[in-house]
């Protein structure tokens, strides 16, 4: 059949297998051009890498950079729905297939484990695989985005919420497909919702992974572990950083400090990344309007980055520098949101957001760029793919 995107409430309900494959191949191509022999000369390099949440966005870019930039062996974990002959799989499932196929072609070791990374069963599978291969991890990337987590100790399923504290949040958001502007409101969270969000999106599971891998002797001396986070602009603070998600991110940062204290042989960091269109960010109110405005400003300035540009910069200019140092802020966080939060960028973005109406959103902001990134994360609007061609089956790429 001919496959067109099915979008409802900022969620794309289907995926294009060949589009996903081409998207992965394009990122691999970019990585090879960016992480040159000159970039790597005299710097340490990752050899054995575990990526938790490897199938989309920053996690996928991290795995691609490790493997195709530095030649690392990778184990990836993600929870995806497989395609069948007649039914769509999730984009991440096709991305994983494309990654493994490309790795095999280049003789790179890659194992993708499909399942709930929050569970102890999946941790045991990773441990078994690493022992079988005889490797210790020197880089562990924690890039999980999930609305729910079942606590392995209690069996209780916790659900995260995106809510402010204290008072109702009201802000402008835009429908990226119609340009329609609307006010949205979010009611304040109660204590139970805040605690549940920390359970899902805080550092508890990250710490559990590190402890179990450490106990089994699978962490290389000097192993780096990273968890990804976001701070963002003033416009989203009340809902995001000063709300329930912010509470979880604070817990994540506290976890990094604790991991460093308890495991002197490893280095744990939170990496604060740029705001981008991912399957996770597309459903956050206010974010589409902010990102469409940000993209406009940064593209005009010439320093706009997507996931792969951000992550190759993270590896080349933060994690694996020639002088061996990892630059951090006063909270020991790696900052690659630096270009996003430059004062002139934020001033220009705020000014744009003030002027936006339903009539001028398309011309004033980069809604077209936002739409492209949103569709491309599901395998659509990818250059070089004929979307009028029939897709014969959905269980392969």
UniProtKB/Swiss-Prot annotation:
Used in the biosynthesis of medium-chain volatile alcohols as biofuels engineered by microorganisms. The switch from the native flavin-dependent enoyl-CoA reductase used in the production of n-butanol, a key second-generation biofuel, to a flavin-independent trans-enoyl-CoA reductase from T.denticola leads to an order of magnitude increase in product yield in engineered E.coli. NAD(+) binds at residues 53-58, 79-80, 116-117, 144-145, 249, 276-278. GO terms for biological process: fatty acid biosynthetic process. Keywords: Fatty acid biosynthesis, Fatty acid metabolism, Lipid biosynthesis, Lipid metabolism, NAD, Oxidoreductase. Its EC number is 1.3.1.44. GO terms for molecular function: enoyl-[acyl-carrier-protein] reductase (NADH) activity; NAD binding; trans-2-enoyl-CoA reductase (NADH) activity. The active site is at 240 (proton donor). Changing residue 277 to A: Significant decrease of the catalytic efficiency. The catalytic efficiency is slightly reduces and the affinity is relatively similar to wild-type. Inhibited by lauroyl-CoA. It comes from the Bacteria. It catalyses: a 2,3-saturated acyl-CoA + NAD(+) = a (2E)-enoyl-CoA + NADH + H(+). The record marks 80 as: Plays an important role in discriminating NADH against NADPH. Substrate binds at residue 230. Changing residue 291 to A: The catalytic efficiency and affinity are relatively similar to wild-type toward crotonyl-CoA and hexenoyl-CoA. Pathway: Lipid metabolism; fatty acid biosynthesis. Belongs to the TER reductase family. PANTHER family: ENOYL-[ACYL-CARRIER-PROTEIN] REDUCTASE [NADH]. Possesses high activity for the reduction reaction, but no activity for the reverse oxidation reaction. Involved in the fatty acid synthesis (FAS II). Catalyzes the reduction of the carbon-carbon double bond of crotonyl-CoA to yield butyryl-CoA. In vitro it can also use hexenoyl-CoA and dodecenoyl-CoA as substrates. Monomer. This is Trans-2-enoyl-CoA reductase [NADH]. It comes from Treponema denticola (strain ATCC 35405 / DSM 14222 / CIP 103919 / JCM 8153 / KCTC 15104). The lineage of its organism: Bacteria, Pseudomonadati, Spirochaetota, Spirochaetia, Spirochaetales. The gene is fabV.
